[in-house]
Amino acid sequence: MAYARALLKLSGEALMGDQGYGIDPAIVQAIAKDVAGVVASGTQLAIVVGGGNIFRGLKGSAAGMDRATADYVGMLATVMNAITLQDGLERAGIPTRVQTAIEMQEVAEPYIRRRAIRHLEKGRVVVFGAGCGNPFFTTDTTAALRAAEISADVVFKATKVDGVYDKDPHKYADAVRYDTLTFQQVLSGELAVMDSTAIALCKDNNIPIVVFNLFEAGNIGRAVAGEPIGSRISN
């Protein structure tokens, strides 16, 4: 066990698989299987999930919606994903709690930092939904914020690619992957990892970020064990 407490950031797009929209139950099942191994190893795990598989605030804003309104709709989409993820994890035998930044007590606990930490200490997975509760902030920034609040040792960003590249590997065959890089390199190079607010938060709080491919079975466990997969960003 390389990390005692970790925060896993899952994009909404990751949950939809190849469907193009919504949630692929097979993806949820695969994530639950990986997470079960992590919890069994003794690592405390929190998860922040995005909502882009259902609704993305920026796209809504581009289509003419008020930006704040669009972001609130996006936050509600993350709650749908969080509850679905909770169901999948619990069916895999993992005790899980959902906490939301916008209060909706009939379906989830409100976000309370000390309660979240207590859940983690008891071996429960905590899934954070509704972003940070404020428009104009991404779920990547939420991941950095929650990681700092719960004193996580690391942020894992599970994506569709196997690390950070100097350019889009899907478009350019000569794209080069970084094994390690600094927060300053990411910020000055404008590399597509997380938005600058999220990167700056992790930089200021000295929380490393590991970017890896979610769709390779067992990768979440490998990342938690400290195996050299993906790209590691640190000070």
Curated annotation (Swiss-Prot):
GO terms for biological process: 'de novo' CTP biosynthetic process; UDP biosynthetic process. Its EC number is 2.7.4.22. It is an enzyme of class 2 (transferase). One of its GO terms (molecular function) is ATP binding. Keywords: Allosteric enzyme, ATP-binding, Cytoplasm, Kinase, Nucleotide-binding, Pyrimidine biosynthesis, Transferase. UMP binds at G51, D71, C132, G133, N134, P135, F136, F137, T138, T139. It is found in: Cytoplasm. Residues 17-22 are annotated as: Involved in allosteric activation by GTP. It catalyses: UMP + ATP = UDP + ADP. Its main location: cytoplasm. Signal peptide: none annotated. Belongs to the UMP kinase family. Homohexamer. This is Uridylate kinase.
